[in-house]
């Protein structure tokens, strides 16, 4: 089972980059400022948002996600997937004055399962309560050093990184 989970994590990470481009990923560390915080990304409702726009008074929680990763959506009968916790996490963040955004940087499947139309359908089916934006060319993911989905980054009100990692310890 561990081998299957490791393989799935590797596949999800690889889907976040394109084979045509060789891009060195950054590595954000606690205290680092959020790169590209003012970069506009298209939400599933057509609106353009940046992290600055979506931040609450105490910061912003950025969750890299997609419609297809088994760690996000689960694997039938084997694992539950993290996306069923997204709304709970977003609700807790909102109570603390923190904005939340889901970022889809899966360029490899942009014309298929992770297209804007599929993102809209997936968000509706999952009942997302936060913006779900597309990271064209995986620019934000590369700037953050996001390697897998889900990958979580919590920034304070000054856009300094406080946490980077998984959603919880499950």
Predicted regions and their residues:
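Positively charged n-region of N-terminal signal peptides that target proteins for export
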Residues: 1-5
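Bacterial N-terminal signal peptides
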Residues: 6-17
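N-terminal "domain-start" segment that seeds a small globular fold
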Residues: 21-52, 81
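Short active-site neighborhood of thiol/selenol oxidoreductases, capturing the structured segment around
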Residues: 50-79
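Loop/turn elements at helix/coil->beta-strand transitions in domains of secreted/extracellular proteins
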Residues: 57-60, 95-100, 127-131, 149, ...
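Structural microenvironment flanking redox-active thiols in thiol-disulfide oxidoreductases
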Residues: 73-125, 139-140
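Short, internal strand/loop/helix patches
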Residues: 119-156, 162
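Non-catalytic, surface beta->alpha helical segment in thiol-disulfide oxidoreductase systems
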Residues: 160-170
